[in-house]
Amino acid sequence: MAKHRLQQVADTMQRVLGDVIQKELKDPRVGFATVTGVEVSADLQHAKVRISVMGSPEEREAAMAALQRARGFLRKRVAEEMSYMRFVPELHLIQDTSLDYTMHMDEVFRAIQHERLVNPPKLDDEQ
């Protein structure tokens, strides 16, 4: 299947899943979950759904467990919204930790910047 078509399917699935998670799932454990990306296999049999969840590690784990249990409902809603598709991919929900990594790296850079302000590096002439 053409890459353009796969990307269209992935983008539509991301929008649909994001809306369903935010507006239709009633499980309070889900909290602030955001669909950050969807990758669809070339044969449209599988879709990796990346989800970013805010909260403590325990809250994130509980939210991902709740989303895993809701996979059937999510897939059904995708099928309803994308009724033009003959087959709806199996959803593989993956916790997206890239935001955590970005925040961690930001903290590291801020610490380095602070250290340079407190203890500026010595120039060769000053040694």
Curated annotation (Swiss-Prot):
GO terms for cellular component: cytosol. One of its GO terms (biological process) is ribosome biogenesis. It holds the Pfam family RBFA. Keywords: Cytoplasm, Ribosome biogenesis. One of its GO terms (molecular function) is ribosomal small subunit binding. It is found in: Cytoplasm. InterPro entries: KH_dom-like_a/b, RbfA, RbfA_dom_sf. It comes from the Bacteria. Belongs to the RbfA family. NCBIfam families: rbfA. One of several proteins that assist in the late maturation steps of the functional core of the 30S ribosomal subunit. Associates with free 30S ribosomal subunits (but not with 30S subunits that are part of 70S ribosomes or polysomes). Required for efficient processing of 16S rRNA. May interact with the 5'-terminal helix region of 16S rRNA. Monomer. Binds 30S ribosomal subunits, but not 50S ribosomal subunits or 70S ribosomes. This is Ribosome-binding factor A. It comes from Chloroflexus aurantiacus (strain ATCC 29366 / DSM 635 / J-10-fl). The lineage of its organism: Bacteria, Bacillati, Chloroflexota, Chloroflexia, Chloroflexales.
